[in-house]
Regions:
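TOPRIM metal-binding catalytic domain and adjacent DNA-binding surface shared by DnaG-type primases
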Residues: 2-88, 92, 123-131
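Phosphate-handling DNA/RNA-contact segment within nucleic-acid enzymes
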Residues: 68-176
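Short linear motifs in intrinsically disordered/low-complexity regions
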Residues: 3, 41, 118, 142, ...
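Acidic, divalent-metal-binding catalytic cores of TOPRIM
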Residues: 39, 49, 157, 169-185
């Protein structure tokens, strides 16, 4: 198995497209592993529909996966594999992963590793100071706004309770904070 190693590079730096695998296991966590596959035209077309291109995906550590395996809380092993009709994408964090399966009728989201509490997406990419910050309902909205040069973050869901200290910190950094949640059910 090859280790996936994150290196902080400028978005314009060349990016390796080798297939890579990561395996994580700690005593207090369920083990998980995944295999990264290069973005192909079909995978990029899914994101392009939302105005999101590969540079934005790379900047936010979004990867396409060939497979993901873990075990349930009861200890039962499972593996899911990407297909042309059911791709698997991963939001890779430090010590955790959030799996997104946009076309899956069930299990659209899976989690591995030690998820931070509270979980947030996009916090590392926003500037220390700015005019407007959008808080959205999900990662795809963050990616789309960022691809169009807006600052955005999200928490795990639209129903997540955002800690007061985070709101206060963001208020010191941005002149305007706009909640931009979906109106669908």
């Amino acid at each position: 198995l090859h280790k996936f190693v994150s290196t902080k590079t400028k978005p314009t730096a060349p990016i390796s497209l080798q297939c890579q695998t990561k395996h994580v296991e700690k005593a207090d966590e369920l083990p998980y592993s995944f295999e990264i596959q290069p973005f192909d035209a079909a995978l990029l077309a899914y994101w392009a529909h939302y105005g999101i291109y590969e540079e934005t995906l790379r900047r936010f550590r979004v990867r396409a996966l060939k497979s993901y395996s873990s075990q349930t809380r009861e200890g039962k092993q499972f593996e899911i594999r990407a297909t042309p009709t059911e791709p698997i994408f991963a939001y890779i964090g430090n010590g955790y992963i959030k799996i997104y399966r946009p076309n899956s009728p069930k299990m659209r989201f899976l989690y591995g590793g030690q998820m931070p509490n509270p979980y947030s997406f996009g916090m590392e990419q926003i500037p220390s100071k700015g005019d407007i910050l959008f808080i959205t309902g999900g990662e795809k909205d963050v990616l789309s706004l960022s691809a169009h040069h807006f600052h955005a973050i999200c928490f795990n869901s639209e129903t997540a309770q955002i800690p007061e200290n985070i709101i206060e910190s963001l208020q010191l950094r941005f002149r305007h904070i706009i909640l931009l949640y979906d109106t669908d059910e």
